[in-house]
Amino acid sequence: MKFNKHLQNIKTYEAGKPIELVVREYGIEPQDIVKLASNENPLGCSPKVIDAVGKILTKMSLYPDDSMISLKNALSKRYNVDSENVIIGSGSDQVIEFLIHAKAHSGSKILMNSITFAMYEIYSKHVGADVIRTSSQEHDLDEFYELYKQEKPEIIFICTPNNPTGDALDAQKIYNFLEKIDNDTLVVVDAAYMEYAIVKDAKKEINVKELIQKHSNVIYLGTFSKAYGLGGMRVGYGISEAKIIKELYKLRPPFNITTLSLEAATVALSDEEFVQKSTALNLEQMKRYEEFAKEQKIDIINSYTNFVTLSLGSNQNSTKIASQLLQNGMIVRDLSSYNMNAIRVTIGTQEQNSRFFKLVIKFL
């Protein structure tokens, strides 16, 4: 049987191992496993969300409100934009998929950082586009601009804060870069971890309203999977000029967000106290990782997210260490697939982080 020829060059995306799989593979009891691999909120989600979702369980037999008007209005209010500027996806990665299918085709060029979110490349290959990468690990917008002039890409991806490294750009640098890009090149600003970044450094915050008013070729992406603690609900969004959103809607399948997910995201957005609690805990515990890395003489990338990336020495192997941790009930992310001898560790609770420190020392 023949399949789309572009699939031959695509590797399946491997998400962080779920706890259930570790239970089956290693026979470790669930309560003895700590998952610090997928950048989930260690506090879970807002109690208000749990209460609200519980009250609508009887509606599961009904299709959701496909207009998603309550959530769109809530996001519009949060960012001070019109609802016509908002599209909701099953995770922000679905919006990324829409964008690439809407703008790129076989032979198109798509520009991204050398190390960044893997789904940009995977979706690019869906349509047979050519991926152009920078040479630097961190987002060097001067290099981005030089490659933009040389390659004339259809789409540019800027991931800030970046996954899986955690570094972030000052908003002003992004604004300056956008001034030099023509209106026919789509620029995607993926800000999945922005709630964490702005707590650490206010200079990272992007004024979304001004962004889309000044630039008709830009879309801003956000998600409920991280600071809001709704990774299992799969809700993300894009904010852009109404004309772009209208085109993306042509690719959106009906009822792509469930009734429970819509309710959860809408309520989560209203509970600012929970997000503040989550980001405060994250910043507090991040300092412990920075101190630990200094004590152990491990290179740590300055992170503006809810994870840290620990770069290992030449006498260490990230795959081996991640495997040793896994066998002891500690799930972290090996970054060897990004050509990095490093592990990415989600910042957990105080207890979870203490357990990681105590365990990883044995294998360093």
Swiss-Prot record:
The GO terms describing molecular function are: histidinol-phosphate transaminase activity; pyridoxal phosphate binding
Per its record, the protein catalyses: L-histidinol phosphate + 2-oxoglutarate = 3-(imidazol-4-yl)-2-oxopropyl phosphate + L-glutamate
Which residues are recorded as modified (N6-(pyridoxal phosphate)lysine)? 226
UniProt-listed Enzyme Commission number(s): 2.6.1.9
Question: Alphabetically, which GO biological process terms does the record hold?
Answer: L-histidine biosynthetic process
Oligomeric state and interaction partners are given as: Homodimer.
Entry keywords, A to Z:
Amino-acid biosynthesis, Aminotransferase, Histidine biosynthesis, Pyridoxal phosphate, Transferase
| Family, as annotated | Belongs to the class-II pyridoxal-phosphate-dependent aminotransferase family. Histidinol-phosphate aminotransferase subfamily.
Enzyme class, broadest EC rank: transferase
State the protein's name: Histidinol-phosphate aminotransferase
Pathway(s) per entry = Amino-acid biosynthesis; L-histidine biosynthesis; L-histidine from 5-phospho-alpha-D-ribose 1-diphosphate: step 7/9
**Name of encoding gene:** hisC
Cysteine pairs forming cystine bridges in this chain are none
Is Transferase tagged as a keyword? yes
Q: Which residues cross the membrane?
A: none
